[in-house]
């Protein structure tokens, strides 16, 4: 598993207009070629009256699966420029379809490249990008009297508290890079004078916004 990678924040759409033509970018997270192709077909069915539904996707830790489709636009003017935007932003496991409704003015090859790549770029700005970091989920159990201390420490150290449970005792689940767990445990033990129990809940990806 990768220690970290970038992908889209969420599925979404964004529209731009160029010389009367509408370009609607649709984004979806995907983990297989089947998922990507299914997503593309879904968009094509929804926008069956559109002039074109061009698409691109990247899948896998090393981008093992990647495809670009022009859907009737001149070869190399749509799918490949769209794919290049995904690569430039270092994204993984993403599919994008750009739906075009022709507005009456031809854009030429260069204009099409700029339009399709621009639709993807503007769409990414609108829906956002996140960095997924592989982190250890560490549960801390302690007395209610220490809630403020732990919250303040985590806040000042930029350590996310991803879950809080209040029962007989308090249990916070914190998300940390694996290499920082030991130092964090030592700091909490010192802070709470050893009045704390730890349990590792395993590793999972935590998402951080990319500005």
Locations of regions flagged by a protein language model:
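C-terminal regulatory domains involved in ligand/effector binding and gene-expression control
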Residues: 1-76, 199-211
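Structural motif
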Residues: 25, 54-55, 93-96, 137, ...
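Active-site beta-strand/loop microenvironment that shapes enzyme catalytic pockets
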Residues: 78-126
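Short glycine-/aliphatic-rich beta-strand segments at the starts of folded cytosolic domains
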Residues: 128-144
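Short amphipathic alpha-helix segments
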Residues: 141-159
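Short amphipathic alpha-helices in soluble, non-transmembrane regions
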Residues: 150-155, 183-192
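Conserved short beta-strand edge segments in small beta-sheet-based binding/regulatory domains
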Residues: 161-165, 192-209
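Terminal, non-globular segments
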Residues: 174-183
């Amino acid at each position: 598993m990768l220690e970290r990678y970038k992908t889209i924040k969420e599925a979404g759409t964004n529209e731009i207009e160029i010389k009367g033509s509408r370009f609607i970018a649709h984004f979806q997270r995907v983990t297989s070629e089947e998922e990507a192709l299914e997503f593309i077909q879904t968009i094509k069915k929804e926008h069956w009256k559109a002039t074109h539904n061009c698409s691109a996707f990247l899948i896998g830790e090393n981008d093992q699966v990647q495809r670009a489709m022009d859907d009737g636009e001149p070869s190399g003017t749509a799918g490949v420029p769209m794919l290049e935007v995904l690569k430039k932003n270092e994204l993984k496991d993403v599919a994008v379809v750009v739906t075009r409704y022709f507005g009456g003015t031809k854009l030429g090859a260069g204009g099409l490249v700029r339009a399709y790549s621009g639709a993807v770029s503007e769409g990414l700005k609108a829906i956002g990008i996140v960095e997924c970091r592989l982190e250890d989920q560490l549960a801390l159990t302690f007395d209610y009297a220490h809630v403020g201390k732990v919250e303040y420490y985590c806040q000042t150290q930029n350590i996310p508290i991803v879950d809080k449970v209040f029962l007989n005792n308090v249990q916070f689940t914190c998300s940390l890079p694996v290499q920082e767990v030991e130092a964090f445990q030592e700091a909490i033990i010192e802070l709470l004078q050893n009045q704390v129990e730890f349990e590792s809940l395993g590793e999972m990806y935590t998402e951080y916004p990319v500005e």
